[in-house]
Amino acid sequence: MKQRLDRIARMSEEQRLNSIHQFWNLPEDAVFSPEVVALVCDMSLSWLQAKRCQGNGIPFVKVGPRKVGYTKRDVLEFLSKNRYLNT
């Protein structure tokens, strides 16, 4: 997990903005890494990982034996369902 946290921390501001821009410009069936989703949603990687384990976060796909990804469609649906008018 530390490697992933370091990966985001090592990204330049330009790389972060490019990742976010790419997310918004690709089709809804595109699959994104947890790092990109964390940047787009302003969430931590540890939050995404915890919610994957608990089963109540953004739906994910296994893209390899040790890799997960998120479709843009699932990310947008999750954000839409979790909108609030007050606290």
Question: PLM ranges: what are they?
Answer:
Residues 1-50, 67, 72-87:
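Basic Lys/Arg-rich amphipathic helical interaction modules
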Residues 55-56, 82:
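The DNA-recognition helices of helix-turn-helix-type DNA-binding domains
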Residues 59-68:
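Short Lys/Arg-enriched helix C-cap and helix-to-coil transition segments
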